[in-house]
């Protein structure tokens, strides 16, 4: 049996379902680039038929990602499969992932069909997808609660129809490792054509078993694991891929399998997903938590000083954690900034050097010394800014006392400068009142977060907001050494997204009227 475990990442599809607001196309592309650097084999980029935004995201990622195979999800419905193929066709090679429910409760209460009908629908869907690509994956939704006879029948039929990967999801996180491993083992024992497909698993974490179930499945013969970075996902989340990768690396002698993951990219990828998704990583999380390599016990510290292996089964360096060297200042040139970006593994097509260098100089003038993590934060925020941003903050002045604060701003609105001043319950409130007055948008803030990016009193601060506008939620991000300015950038990020959506809607309406 092949000892290579395929890593299938669904952060951009299943993981995004956990977010308060959808990621933008640019945000998804940043994450896709990071997953490609990480060495992920398959990137499930979205569900194209679900929305125009998802279609565009899948299409954009398929066009730009070269070293990982891009995949799109579809129900076992022809129009879904057609939409997936249309979005993916710009890729050199791609995968279509189609699925249907197989558990008794899903078949009877959700689909309201006979099992014979469901098998026929699955076969038809796989054959339809094979018209577009040889790489078709079929998932038995809620396989963990599917009667084993029915599951074996469905798997055999899907393989005969042309599926080359069969995914066995524990959709509601119901099983335990011995049980789930037994399901995989039974499939290998009872499905006659099982050798013609790779068996994949997709485990949810409702009972905290997703990683353990996935490892049990590998031991039973599964050779693809699906999951997300940091384990983000619907309800309690998905199998955390960074944990799977490090378990396989650390216990390779026991498990006898490998992955193509570049382990020293794990920490950076985890932080990026956390930042763009506005989902903090719990400090005690395995592998990537802030305390994952901390030792506070005196007995442990004594042992570590004598021999690190006494209490450390893996090193911080193995996931890419390293001490940050300080060697960039306002006197550093573009070549020095580019050299640091190169050393961190970023390709030139992943960022705009001119925009990054401009932001770097502003930061260096403020704090004097710039670390690699500062550059990364600046790059991520710079990438989120659109060249066609209608609203841009040109000037900000704050006067704050113990009771009220006054803020004055100059805002570029499509090139025209507008000024406003306001009083509020603190500088951020006053700033937001100014922006609301100039732009005319009535926005409800659902969530406001401030987090430190980097170290020290002069470190960067990141503002994240979730805003509600006409029933739709938007995520805005801002980064600055000044948290008031970062807060303003976050709101303008949202307002520019709303403005672009309004412009697109107006164009569509004009086309519709012209057609009529």
Curated annotation (Swiss-Prot):
List the residue ranges of the region (Regulatory domain). Answer: 392-516
Chain residues that bind Mn(2+): 14, 202, 204, 238
Organism per entry: Vibrio cholerae serotype O1 (strain ATCC 39315 / El Tor Inaba N16961)
- Compartment(s): Cytoplasm
Please report a single Pfam family linked to this protein: LeuA_dimer
How is the subunit organization of this protein annotated in UniProt?
Homodimer.
Q: Could you say which EC number(s) this protein's record lists?
A: 2.3.3.13
Is Metal-binding there in the keyword field? Answer: yes
Named in its record, the pathway it takes part in is: Amino-acid biosynthesis; L-leucine biosynthesis; L-leucine from 3-methyl-2-oxobutanoate: step 1/4
What's this protein's name? 2-isopropylmalate synthase
- What is the role of the protein in this entry? Catalyzes the condensation of the acetyl group of acetyl-CoA with 3-methyl-2-oxobutanoate (2-ketoisovalerate) to form 3-carboxy-3-hydroxy-4-methylpentanoate (2-isopropylmalate).
Task: List, separated by semicolons, the cofactors it needs.
Answer: Mn(2+)
SMART domains to which the protein is assigned, alphabetical: LeuA_dimer (SM00917)
Under PROSITE patterns, the record lists: AIPM_HOMOCIT_SYNTH_1, AIPM_HOMOCIT_SYNTH_2, PYR_CT
Q: Which domain of life is it from?
A: Bacteria
């Amino acid at each position: 049996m092949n000892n290579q475990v395929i890593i299938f990442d669904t952060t951009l599809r299943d993981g995004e379902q956990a977010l308060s607001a959808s990621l933008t196309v640019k945000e998804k592309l940043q994450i896709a680039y990071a997953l490609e650097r990480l060495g992920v084999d398959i990137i499930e980029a979205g569900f194209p038929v679900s929305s125009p935004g998802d279609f565009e995201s899948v299409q954009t990622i398929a066009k730009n990602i070269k070293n990982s195979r891009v995949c799109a999800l579809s129900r076992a419905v022809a129009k879904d499969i057609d939409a997936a193929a249309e979005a993916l066709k710009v890729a050199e090679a791609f995968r279509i992932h189609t699925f249907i429910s197989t558990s008794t409760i899903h078949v009877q209460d959700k689909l309201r069909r006979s099992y014979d009908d469901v098998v026929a629908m699955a076969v038809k869907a796989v054959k339809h997808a094979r018209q577009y690509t040889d790489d078709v994956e079929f998932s038995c939704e809620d396989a963990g609660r599917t009667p084993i006879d029915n599951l074996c029948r469905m798997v055999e039929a899907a393989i005969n129809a042309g599926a080359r990967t069969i995914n066995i999801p524990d959709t509601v996180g119901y099983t335990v490792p011995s049980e789930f491993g037994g399901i995989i083992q039974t499939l290998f024992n009872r499905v006659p054509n099982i050798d013609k497909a790779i068996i994949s698993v997709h485990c949810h974490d409702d009972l905290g078993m997703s990683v353990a179930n996935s490892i049990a499945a590998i031991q039973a013969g599964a050779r693809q694991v699906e999951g997300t970075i940091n384990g983000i996902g619907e309800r309690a989340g998905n199998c955390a891929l960074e944990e799977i990768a490090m378990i396989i690396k650390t216990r390779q002698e026991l498990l006898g399998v490998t992955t193509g993951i570049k382990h020293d990219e794990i920490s950076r990828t985890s932080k990026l997903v956390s930042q763009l998704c506005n989902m903090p990583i719990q400090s005690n999380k395995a592998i990537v938590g802030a305390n994952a390599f901390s030792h506070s016990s005196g007995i442990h510290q004594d042992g570590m000083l004598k021999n690190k292996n006494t209490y450390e089964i893996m090193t911080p360096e193995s996931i890419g954690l390293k001490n940050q060297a300080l060697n960039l200042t306002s006197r550093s040139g573009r070549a020095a900034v580019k050299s640091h970006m190169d050393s961190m593994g970023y390709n030139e097509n992943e960022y705009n050097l001119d925009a990054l260098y401009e932001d770097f100089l502003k930061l260096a003038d403020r704090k004097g010394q710039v670390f690699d993590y500062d550059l990364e934060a600046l790059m991520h925020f710079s990438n989120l800014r659109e060249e066609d941003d209608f609203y841009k903050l040109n000037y900000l002045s704050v006067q704050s006392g113990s009771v009220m604060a006054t803020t004055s701003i100059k805002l570029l609105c499509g090139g025209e400068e507008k000024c406003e001043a306001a009083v509020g319950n603190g500088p951020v409130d006053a700033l937001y009142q100014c922006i609301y007055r100039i732009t005319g948008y009535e926005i409800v803030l659902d969530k406001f977060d401030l987090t430190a990016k980097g170290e020290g009193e002069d470190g960067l601060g990141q503002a994240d907001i979730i805003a509600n506008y006409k029933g739709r939620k938007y995520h805005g991000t801002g980064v600055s050494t000044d948290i008031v300015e970062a807060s303003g950038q976050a709101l303008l990020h949202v307002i520019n997204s709303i403005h672009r959506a309004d412009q697109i809607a107006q164009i569509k309406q004009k086309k519709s009227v012209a057609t009529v």
